[in-house]
Amino acid sequence: MNERQYAAAGVDLVSADQAKARIAVLVAGTRTDLSVGQVGAFGGMVRVPPGLRRPVLVLSTDGVGTKVLVALEAGRFDTVGEDLVNHSVNDILVHGATPVAFMDYVAGAGLTVQQIAGIVEGVARGCRQHEMALAGGETAQMPGLYQPGNFDLAGTIIGVVEEDQALHGDGIRPGDVLLGYQSTGLHTNGYTLARRIIFQQQQLQVGDRLGD
């Protein structure tokens, strides 16, 4: 099939190539001393950090849920990418793991090059903050499955921890001290309910201020 046939089916190969070129630059900017191989390969490769006696890999896959609808409403796409990374880091941190690499997945229809690049820019920024490589990912155009302009975002994180230092929760006992930290916000959870309260019940819009 040629570009014209793909375009008629709703897949823009020209824009896809432009997005890939911009993504490659962003990915290259996250490479660490553990990175192996070339940017754009079918599989992302990273070394296991040196000095570990019995390293255990800790993996987690997650998405940002309906927060993508807030991103679409606000017209800002980099923050959901960064949120995805931070959420994933938290998921493996509870097991005592240090993040090593990340893989992202963007699926949608009718997204512009700027929108796709914005999403991955946020992912790359989050990876740099945590000193881990964005080892690869996938950007899929799926007209017919997604409405034009809509998308979903997910990612997989890989971390590492010494086997005898991994946290499983099975050592928790009555009398242990529980430390709680104040959240900086909703992060990526609860947005279906939050959107209902804020946008439907309260009739607020993006840009409205709450309180003084």
List the predicted regions and their residue ranges.
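Helix-biased detector of long, well-ordered alpha-helical tracts
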Residues: 1-212
